[in-house]
């Protein structure tokens, strides 16, 4: 019995919780070797019995049998895929239908958000927001997809009155870093935490007495060790990916939370500036 095919084709027959389970299994089939029903239930916010019943609905005796069957099917499909299909992104291949691709992408992003939010230390987050709010100058560093996240945050912060530099050129990033002063803040965005350009800038900022805030993964890294504060992000993407999709989703959830927290801290003035910005841009239409 091909359980993966059965799961893909039975979408309309599933309840809301069953669809959660189906989406999780499809998006994480390559990781099932290390997933238990207890972990899965906790992550999805459902009972273990719901997972067992789902497995039985598909014809398996329980979750263990379903899990092992899915692992076997995935391994077999990988061997076939190596010869017939292209590996496009994470667990997505050129043989997947658009519906399956959509489900895999959506679940990948949902998991990144859920796991990242579950890690938040809100007392520490509040402290970080207060530190940023008092900074005379803010530098944001990042490369590739992380640079896009940083650029978005810089626009948001400038809208509510903060002096921000977010340069794409790494030489300029380094130049700005060495000119930071005590009280200034550098927000370094790097999922790996090991990009030499970002680490170099963090070292320079710290040497000048600036506060370094890293938005990075849980992995031990040079950036994590340099930072005064860290904001953790989790992404379920495999090493092979066409683009940092769920990583950017996780990073954006952190930067958006920082922005809204800063708006809340100085709500009256921030809202006035947001309104003025909106009025000005409306005049350009």
UniProtKB/Swiss-Prot annotation:
Quaternary structure and partners: Homotetramer.
Organism lineage string: Bacteria, Pseudomonadati, Pseudomonadota, Gammaproteobacteria, Enterobacterales
Domain of life: Bacteria
Keyword DNA-binding in record: yes
DNA-binding region positions on the chain: 37-56
Keyword list, A-Z: Carbohydrate metabolism, DNA-binding, Repressor, Transcription, Transcription regulation
GO molecular function ontology, one term from the record: carbohydrate derivative binding
Protein's UniProt name: HTH-type transcriptional regulator MurR
Function recorded in the entry: Represses the expression of the murPQ operon involved in the uptake and degradation of N-acetylmuramic acid (MurNAc). Binds to two adjacent inverted repeats within the operator region. MurNAc 6-phosphate, the substrate of MurQ, is the specific inducer that weakens binding of MurR to the operator.
InterPro entries, A to Z: Homeodomain-like_sf, HTH_RpiR, RpiR-like, RpiR-like_SIS, SIS_dom, SIS_dom_sf, Tscrpt_reg_HTH_MurR, WH-like_DNA-bd_sf
Gene that encodes it: murR
Ranges of residues in domain SIS: 128-268
């Amino acid at each position: 019995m091909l359980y993966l095919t059965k799961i893909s084709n039975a979408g309309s027959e599933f309840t809301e919780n069953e669809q959660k389970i189906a989406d999780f299994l499809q998006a994480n089939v390559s990781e099932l070797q290390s997933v238990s029903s207890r972990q899965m239930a906790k992550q999805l916010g459902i009972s273990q019995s719901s997972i067992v019943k789902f497995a039985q609905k598909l014809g398996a005796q329980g979750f263990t049998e379903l899990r092992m069957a899915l692992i076997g099917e995935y391994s077999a499909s990988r061997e076939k895929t190596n010869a017939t299909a292209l590996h496009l992104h994470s667990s997505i291949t050129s043989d997947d239908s658009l519906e399956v691709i959509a489900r895999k992408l959506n679940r990948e992003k949902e998991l990144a958000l859920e796991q990242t939010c579950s890690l938040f230390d809100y007392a520490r987050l509040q402290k970080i927001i207060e530190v940023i709010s008092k900074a005379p100058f803010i530098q944001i560093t990042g490369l590739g997809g992380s640079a896009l996240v940083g650029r978005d945050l810089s626009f948001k912060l400038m809208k509510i009155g903060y002096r921000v530099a977010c340069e794409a050129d790494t030489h300029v990033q380094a130049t700005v870093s060495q000119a930071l002063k005590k009280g200034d803040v550098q927000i370094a965005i790097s999922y790996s935490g090991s990009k030499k350009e970002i680490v170099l800038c963090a070292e320079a900022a710290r040497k000048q007495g600036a506060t370094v805030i890293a938005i990075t993964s849980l992995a031990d890294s040079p950036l994590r060790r340099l930072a005064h504060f860290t904001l953790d992000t989790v992404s379920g993407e495999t090493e092979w990916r066409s683009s940092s999709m769920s990583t950017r989703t996780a990073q954006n959830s952190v930067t958006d939370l920082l922005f809204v927290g800063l708006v809340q801290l100085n709500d009256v003035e921030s809202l006035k500036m947001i309104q003025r910005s909106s009025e000005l841009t409306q005049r350009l239409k």
